[in-house]
């Protein structure tokens, strides 16, 4: 029992020593990855020839990338500042206003997505728990570069025999930046693991701001990135 206790104590000591980094070191880390984003209360209302289609939003995938600087102010704590691009927004399932079993003229919408393009400035404190393993939290202001809605609309006619004749799909892409807030503030929390200067990280952003000017809607976003740490000051 005593031997097990000392082995556990030794393991704890080794983990804590190996987790320590040199105080005063400065690094930069280019990184790229994937964002999975949605908008809370982000339902889209399609008005088609007097018919309203209320469609809930779903998560969409996007690109994120940039660089972060980190200064080691304590042996187990670092402060980082970054500049990242992130594609956020949401995706919508395909819908139409067709009444099944009833002849008439209808419209269908497909490949509908909302894209919000942000520059993010994350400021985080990282706590190194063990060799290569860290947890992070901080604050992140973001600035909206642009917002676009894209979808394909197809008009079609259903005959009395149930057969349908479709017009060619029309692609629509329009800027809707004026509908959205110019900035966003979020609390990022994450966990990372580093091996041989390669850093894999997952974060979630708790948005504090309304993303849309008139609705109580907020960004929801996960990010998964891979970066490479370069030493500037040792």
Show which residues each predicted segment covers.
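Bacterial Sec-dependent N-terminal signal peptides
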Residues: 1-31, 226, 230-232
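Outer membrane beta-barrel transmembrane domains
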Residues: 167-203, 219-234
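Outer-membrane beta-barrel channels and translocator barrels
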Residues: 23, 74-76, 130, 195-198, ...
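Residues on the lipid-exposed face of transmembrane beta-strands in outer-membrane beta-barrel proteins
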Residues: 30-34, 63-71, 83-85, 121-129, ...
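Transmembrane beta-strand segments that form the barrel wall of outer-membrane beta-barrel proteins
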Residues: 202-212
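Extracellular/periplasm-exposed beta-strand and loop segments of Gram-negative cell-envelope proteins
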Residues: 38-60, 87-117, 144-184, 188, ...
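Short glycine/proline- and aromatic-enriched beta-strand/turn motifs that initiate or cap beta-hairpins
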Residues: 20-68, 231
